[in-house]
């Protein structure tokens, strides 16, 4: 049910996981989804998200390919603890989980959880 200021869900709620297109620059479209996954086939740059809305939150699963040791660099709107981009797990097929919350349209606060399986 919904009111002008609140929405209540009795039961569970789920959102799909959108597959990001792998390429030299990866662009997450926050206007289309909250949750994403990407398998890295090389060192990549994650561009600033398109269509970010303050209060939006979600998850990006980052998967190493069979080679592993892939790296990511990040657009200037992504904010990490200590203003330092995190280091990904490097094993072949490793999975890391980036949890994010859009604080403002120019600040996406993030935390990386390494090697979740």
Short names for language-model regions:
Residues 38-117:
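Acidic, glycine/polar-enriched metal-coordinating patches/loops
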Residues 10, 27, 106-109:
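N-terminal non-cleavable signal-anchor helices
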Residues 6, 25-27, 99:
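Short, surface-exposed charged micro-motifs
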Residues 12-34:
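Transition segment at domain starts
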Residues 9, 28-34, 68-74:
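N-terminal start-of-chain detector that recognizes signal peptides
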Residues 2, 22-24, 87:
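Low-complexity intrinsically disordered segments
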Residues 1-14:
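C-terminal trimerization/auto-chaperone modules of long, extracellular attachment fibers and adhesins
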């Amino acid at each position: 049910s919904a009111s002008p200021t609140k929405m209540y869900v009795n039961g569970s709620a789920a959102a799909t996981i959108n597959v990001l297109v792998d390429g030299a620059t990866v662009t997450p479209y926050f206007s289309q989804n909250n949750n994403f996954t990407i398998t890295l086939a090389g060192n990549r740059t994650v561009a600033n998200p398109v269509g970010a809305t303050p209060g939006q939150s979600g998850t990006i699963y980052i998967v190493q390919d069979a080679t592993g040791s892939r790296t990511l660099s990040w657009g200037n709107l992504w904010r990490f603890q200590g203003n330092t981009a995190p280091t990904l797990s490097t094993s072949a097929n490793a999975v890391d989980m980036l949890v994010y919350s859009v604080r403002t349209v120019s600040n996406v606060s993030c935390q990386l959880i390494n090697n979740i399986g």
